[in-house]
Design a protein with these regions (language model features):
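Hydrophobic Val/Ile/Leu positions in short beta-strands of Rossmann-like dinucleotide-binding domains
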Residues: 7-8
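N-terminal Rossmann-fold NAD(P) dinucleotide-binding loop
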Residues: 15-16
């Protein structure tokens, strides 16, 4: 089996700790976020959410990027983007759709994709796979 290289799409309060945990366990980890400001903060070992300490960021070996093409180096992709709900309690899946579209552009045979974001049953089959 090839070496596992993990990408985390979405570096918020869920994605960043997940990326750090994989990195601590010696997995090559790529952290991706569409927010360039967020990526620049993380490159300086700063987490404004307070979820991960500066010390833990300094010890981690994560490649932070805002270029989705960098995800092509990974073979195990985890999507951790927000899924806010509107005033009618309907989830906004636009960030899931965007993440799936970007990963779909670089996906290789035998790659694995996991949606860690909060979604209702059927989202993978109905929304993610067709993209």
């Amino acid at each position: 089996m090839n070496k596992i290289i993990i990408s985390i799409s979405g570096l918020g309060y869920v994605g960043l700790p997940v990326a750090v945990a994989f990195s601590k366990n010696n997995y090559k980890t790529i952290g991706y976020d569409i927010n360039k400001k967020r990526v620049n903060e993380l490159l300086k070992n700063e987490d404004i959410t307070g979820e991960v300490s500066k010390k833990d960021l300094e010890k981690s070996d994560i490649t932070f990027t805002s270029n989705y093409e960098d995800l092509s180096k990974a073979n195990f992709h985890i999507i951790t983007v927000p899924t806010p709900i509107d005033k009618f309690n309907k989830p906004d899946l636009s960030l899931i759709e965007c993440a799936c579209a970007q990963i779909g552009k670089i996906l290789k045979k035998n790659d694995i994709v996991i949606i860690e974001s909060t979604v209702y049953p059927g989202v993978t089959e109905e929304i993610a796979v067709p993209i």
